[in-house]
Each structure stands twice: as structure tokens, then as C-alpha cells.
From Swiss-Prot:
Phosphorylated at Thr-153 and/or Ser-164 by NLK. Phosphorylation by NLK at these sites represses LEF1-mediated transcriptional activation of target genes of the canonical Wnt signaling pathway. This is Lymphoid enhancer-binding factor 1. Residues 1-60 are annotated as: CTNNB1-binding. Its main location: nucleus. Changing E27A: Prevents nuclear translocation of CTNNB1. Residues 80-96, 267-294 have a biased composition (Basic and acidic residues). SUPFAM superfamilies: HMG-box. It comes from Mus musculus (Mouse). Transcription factor that binds DNA in a sequence-specific manner. Participates in the Wnt signaling pathway. Activates transcription of target genes in the presence of CTNNB1 and EP300. PIASG antagonizes both Wnt-dependent and Wnt-independent activation by LEF1. TLE1, TLE2, TLE3 and TLE4 repress transactivation mediated by LEF1 and CTNNB1. Regulates T-cell receptor alpha enhancer function. Required for IL17A expressing gamma-delta T-cell maturation and development, via binding to regulator loci of BLK to modulate expression. Disulfide bonds: none annotated. The lineage of its organism: Eukaryota, Metazoa, Chordata, Craniata, Vertebrata. One of its GO terms (molecular function) is DNA-binding transcription factor activity. Expressed in Vgamma1.1 and Vgamma2 gamma-delta T-cells, however not expressed in gamma-delta thymocytes fated for Il17a expression (at protein level). Expressed in alpha-beta T-cell lineages. Expressed in the thymus. Found in distinct epithelial cell compartments of the skin and is abundant in the hair-producing progenitors of the follicle.
Length: 397
């Protein structure tokens, strides 16, 4: 358990609680001693605003191991500072609340920034990296670098596994440049060529300009669904537009043809099915034409029909009625009002009409007309059933 500098009591746990925050006083740093001297005598140095601005400037300059102030210090002052940083790693936190210090620290990879969970960070709202944001204090502007982040780095947050940092390139030193006083940031570690993506996030990928030259990898391996890879590839690739699919023209590596190749076949099938439906109707019409048409033979008129035929014009002239039902009722009343002798005349005319009809159509029977109606109904039913059969099959093909 760390002890207070100058405090007595050795390692006695009764002097302080285990959860108490213990401040440490840095020794041997002239810059910090100057700050503590200014804090202890505020009335001599000026108002409170100048002290706060100097504190902000010092807190932003001192933790940066590669800044201008560290280079200007002597080597003897740098060594105890680094030793102190190894002993107390909490003092080197970034003043913005530890944006880049949430993950585990790797001492051998000082040039890299570890970002294990980007979605839980309050600074990253959508889980994506933001461009370098210039932060301006009262006097010194400080720029937060993005450290050459790969454009597909936001996709890493979908997987729970953290990528190990790559090996440090030997030809690029990560130490401080003595001429400019700025650190050389090594390039980011190589991103693996395969990312496990979620199905909902595939359609939101916008590839950069330099992604066109890279090889295309199948996306179906990252999905963990029970259905086969061909179906998942079809659903995922359908969300890409034509200009977003990289690589040379030709069939995809997943075995799915380009949408421009698939759609013409479907368009060619539809006219074929329509032509089949058009050919169904002429076949029924040709069958009707081939059958010999029998003329509809009317049955011979009886006595009442002959009377109606003769007296209809007189009733229409006498009455203003134009409805046939009302005219037929009037003619029926008048027919029943006739005497037997008057009706006998019309019965004789009806008998002659039947004889003439038998001479003209010797084998005719009244059943032929009624049988034709039944035949027509049967043909209509057969046409409707046979017509819907091919139509339904053509629709499902």
C-alpha cells in the first residue's frame, strides 16, 4: 500500500482507510515545483484565471511524452520522469477523461492506441471513428491525432475479440525527432482480411476510393444462421448497389451472378408465360369453329301465340303502355274473353303451322332446343376449368 511522503507510521493500516485517495507529490520536476509555488501564493502571481490557464497548459504539455517541452528538457530530467511514469501510471492519463486509455496498456507498443470498445465510449456516438478534432485551450492549441486509422476499423466493434497489435516496423523509429520535436507515429497494424459482420450492418458499408483494387472476400462465412450460404449471400449482396461492388466484372466469388445478369432471364420468362396464356384462348375458339353450327329452329306457334301476333299492334295503338308484360296481360284477358268459335279459328291456324313445320324439319323435336342449353352450360364449365388450369400452372412456373 503506498504511503504518504513524509508521513509517519510505516505500513500501519489504521492511519488511513483502504479506499481513501492518497495524493502523491512529485519531486525533482522544476516545472511542477513552479506550478505548486504559484498555487501556494496566488496573491503574488495574479488573478485566478491566469493560474487556471497555466494549470491547463501544463497538464496538456507534461503528459505528452513526445511534446515540445519534453524535448527541451535535459536527459537527466527525462529519465526520472519516465521512471516515475512506470511507477505511477495513473498520472499520465489524458486530460480529456481517458478517451484513449480505456483498454489494457501495452508497454512495448507505445506508438499504438488500443480501443477495445468503441460503442461504450461517450465520445464515440455511432461506434465510428471521428476525424482529428483540434482542441484549443487558452494559449496552446492541441490536436488529437487519429493515428492512421483504417477506414474499415468501425467494423471491428461487431466482434468480441480484440485484435492483437502488429509488430513494430524496424525501419521506422518511434522515438522523438530531434529536429522538429514531434513524434513519428508508426502506421496502424495490418487489418485482417476477413471481418465477421452483422447482417444488419452490411448495407451501411461505403467503401473508400482505394478499396477498388483489393480482392473481394466472401461475406457468407461471417453469418451464423441456419440457412445455407447461398441464401445469405443473396440477401447480403442485394443490399449493395452496382457501384459499391468492387473488383473486376464477372461472376462473384460466392457463386451468385450479377443482378444485371439475373434480371433479363426473369424478364424473358414473363412474355413467354403471357404468350402461353394467349395461345389457350384460340384453341377453344378453333374447337368451336370446327364443330358444325346447327341453326336454331323455333317451335311452331300455338293458337294463343297466333292471336297475340295478330292483336298486339292494336293493343299497343290503343294503350300508351310500352311494357311487354302489361301488354301480354291485356292480350291474355282478351283471349279468355273470346268465345269457342272465335278461338277455334286460331286453333285451326296453329294446326296448319305445325304441319308446315313438320314438312320443313321432319326430324326436329323440341327437346333439341332444351338439350342445346344444357350442352352450352357444360361447355362453359369445361372451358372455365380447362382455362384456369393452364393459367395457374403458367403463373407458378
Amino acid at each position: 500500500m503506498p504511503q504518504l511522503s513524509g508521513g509517519g507510521g510505516g505500513g500501519d493500516p489504521e492511519l488511513c482507510a483502504t479506499d481513501e485517495m492518497i495524493p502523491f507529490k512529485d519531486e525533482g520536476d522544476p516545472q511542477k515545483e513552479k506550478i505548486f509555488a504559484e498555487i501556494s501564493h496566488p496573491e503574488e502571481e495574479g488573478d485566478l484565471a491566469d493560474i487556471k490557464s497555466s494549470l491547463v497548459n501544463e497538464s496538456e504539455i507534461i503528459p505528452a511524452s513526445n511534446g515540445h517541452e519534453v524535448v527541451r528538457q535535459a536527459p537527466s530530467s527525462q529519465e526520472p520522469y519516465h521512471d516515475k511514469a512506470r511507477e505511477h501510471p495513473d498520472e499520465g492519463k489524458h486530460p480529456d477523461g481517458g478517451l484513449y486509455n480505456k483498454g489494457p496498456s501495452y508497454s512495448s507498443y507505445s506508438g499504438y492506441i488500443m480501443m477495445p470498445n468503441m460503442n461504450s465510449d461517450p465520445y464515440m456516438s455511432n461506434g465510428s471513428l471521428s476525424p482529428p478534432i483540434p482542441r484549443t485551450s487558452n494559449k496552446v492549441p492541441v490536436v488529437q491525432p487519429s493515428h492512421a486509422v483504417h477506414p474499415l476499423t468501425p467494423l471491428i466493434t461487431y466482434s468480441d475479440e480484440h485484435f492483437s497489435p502488429g509488430s513494430h516496423p524496424s525501419h521506422i523509429p518511434s522515438d522523438v525527432n530531434s529536429k522538429q520535436g514531434m513524434s513519428r507515429h508508426p502506421p496502424a497494424p495490418e487489418i485482417p482480411t476477413f471481418y465477421p459482420l452483422s447482417p444488419g450492418g452490411v448495407g451501411q458499408i461505403t467503401p473508400p476510393i482505394g478499396w477498388q483494387g483489393q480482392p473481394v472476400y466472401p461475406i457468407t462465412g461471417g453469418f451464423r444462421q441456419p440457412y445455407p450460404s447461398s441464401l445469405s449471400g443473396d440477401t447480403s449482396m442485394s443490399r449493395f448497389s452496382h457501384h459499391m461492388i468492387p473488383g473486376p466484372p464477372g461472376p462473384h466469388t460466392t457463386g451468385i451472378p450479377h443482378p444485371a445478369i439475373v434480371t433479363p432471364q426473369v424478364k424473358q420468362e414473363h412474355p413467354h408465360t403471357d404468350s402461353d396464356l394467349m395461345h389457350v384462348k384460340p384453341q377453344h375458339e378453333q374447337r368451336k369453329e370446327q364443330e358444325p353450327k346447327r341453326p336454331h329452329i323455333k317451335k311452331p306457334l300455338n293458337a294463343f301465340m297466333l292471336y297475340m301476333k295478330e292483336m298486339r299492334a292494336n293493343v299497343v295503338a290503343e294503350c300508351t303502355l310500352k311494357e311487354s308484360a302489361a301488354i301480354n296481360q291485356i292480350l291474355g284477358r282478351r283471349w279468355h274473353a273470346l268465345s269457342r268459335e272465335e278461338q277455334a279459328k286460331y286453333y285451326e291456324l296453329a294446326r296448319k303451322e305445325r304441319q308446315l313445320h313438320m314438312q320443313l324439319y321432319p326430324g326436329w323435336s323440341a327437346r333439341d332446343n332444351y338439350g342445346k342449353k344444357k350442352k352450352r352450360k357444360r361447355e362453359k364449365l369445361q372451358e372455365s376449368t380447362s382455362g384456369t388450369g393452364p393459367r395457374m400452372t403458367a403463373a407458378y412456373i
